[in-house]
From Swiss-Prot:
One of its GO terms (molecular function) is iron ion binding. The keyword Lipid metabolism does not apply. Its cofactor is heme. It holds the Pfam family p450. InterPro entries: Cyt_P450 (IPR001128), Cyt_P450_B (IPR002397), Cyt_P450_sf (IPR036396). CDD domains: CYP105-like. It is an enzyme of class 1 (oxidoreductase). Its EC number is 1.14.-.-. The gene is CYP55A2. Belongs to the cytochrome P450 family. The lineage of its organism: Eukaryota, Fungi, Dikarya, Ascomycota, Pezizomycotina. PANTHER family: P450, PUTATIVE (EUROFUNG)-RELATED (PTHR46696:SF6). This is Cytochrome P450 55A2.
Amino acid sequence: MASEPPSFPFQRASGMEPPAEFARLRATDPVSKVKLFDGSLAWLVTKYKDVTFVATDERLSKVRTRPGFPELNAGGKQAAKAKPTFVDMDAPDHMNQRGMVESLFTLEHVKKLQPYIQKTVDDLLAAMKKKGCANGPVDLVKEFALPVPSYIIYTILGVPFNDLDHLTNQNAIRTNGSSTAREASAANQELLDYLASLVEKRLEEPKDDLISKLCTEQVKPGNIEKADAVQIAFLLLVAGNATMVNMIALGVVTLFQHPEQLAQLKANPSLAPQFVEELCRYHTASALAIKRTAKVDLEIGGKHIKANEGIIASNQSANRDADIFENPDEFNMNRKWPAEDPLGYGFGPHRCIAEHLAKAELTTVFATLFKEFPDLNIAVPFEKINFTPLGGDVGVVDLPVTF
């Protein structure tokens, strides 16, 4: 008799290690069934070639209300009923809505933002320096990793500077895992209400920001409703924020685990881009986002998938696929990259819209942090670092440092 499919999501093996099941499945059963929280079954895809196939094949749907779409928890099942944004649409709706904001996330536009990104990083480090650590270690997550991406995305959206701290705090309550469900839900609602009032203001008095662009180019001509503009702004605000906070903190921890690479980066900050590239492969901070349901019967990796069966493609597992990446479980910022892209930001038409922005922020952070704080040190032993719960995306809840 066939054994019962394992429950998914898998638990990470430890604080920063991906689930051990992935390596076993890549070797023995790369496309296999897993059991979800509600008892339903879905296909789990673990090899690079199959994951990229899932991310690009138009016979698979991203629409969460379709039969068989795999939700990973009760919250996801509830969220699936809400009005979708472009991340949960198929072509042509997906590109129509994504195209409304994509110009603000192109490489060219991000290059124009670079002085502002650098100033944000510099200002936050200066504030940290001023505060000092004479009274004990400082939490690098609270003082730096959280505000860097928060301030930048809020500014792109058009949030006035005076509101940044309060909204950053609300977003932290929403995502940090230590809040109660009620607190997280209240913070969520507060952010939505705030963005709704900002949409109203920008309809009256547009400025040079993303919400004004949506109001002027899309809401006023009747292409989308006001509520859609709020949802798109909310998506851009929350989708990448927790992952960015985690990547900054994980990057610092990873460097201290690899002192020879830390020494290299300190001596030559221009190595930051290749460090960031490896960081995004090694720690897949958004590891559970490539989910689909089959519109028709098809084959993936030699398995027959029926219409209306759910599929979860693990970019986290694909990023450790030895057929693509040499010594994949080794962190090596000097690695020789294959022709294939690492999948930290997904793949295909739904690839993360803010990838260029995220990489610019991370590169600026890691080119600057150790220049300003050459004596930065983690103030607790590695085994005492407070990682995010093992059942979700990899991250660091708080990181006490001295400098």
